[in-house]
């Protein structure tokens, strides 16, 4: 199982939207996906209809009162399971009353140990991280194979992103490979075009692939449908497919590129609840990635 953490120290860069669309794209390609929503806001959990009941699930999991299998929830989207958000966990973790949990986190291996229990059950685990930088994040960085950082191509965002990546690369606690990509790109803006044209000249961690700012991407939280379910034919899909292909090439994950080419649908073994979060016909086909 490959572990990818979607992270940025600041909010508003599209971490959750990217998480949801990547999960649905990978499931559509036939990969089994575990989504772990570590953002207390719970956007990813909301999308899949699996909002947490604020019962300290994460705290009890890390304190070994629960197993990871007890907190994993199935979804109506075939091939995607979710560990939903826990809005109380961050506050409790930082609270003095949670000293035991904090001590358990100090070795920064607890997240990795927890995910190792399901490493043979999924192809990919995607973690939707909260903004900021806490001890929790160091645990995530230790567990993740890839730290994927969405960023907006604007001066302050680029400056802050460079500082963040330099700090992460010099940190002994960060074991992950670090890659970044431009998100919410508007090519009609001269500054966005400028940063697109200069990427990779000085920073080889910035991917060539980018995700544009399209209304259909922005609307996924309202419709509770990823772009891979809203439209059968959409050029937006291709941007995510190209992004994933470049990630796999940089990470040498060739076995995860269109490996099975199945179609996301509702599990035949477990009929979806009514109404389902995602509805797809059996004849929906995956858009082929363009080489252009």
Residue locations for each model-derived region?
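P-loop NTP-binding core
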Residues: 1-292
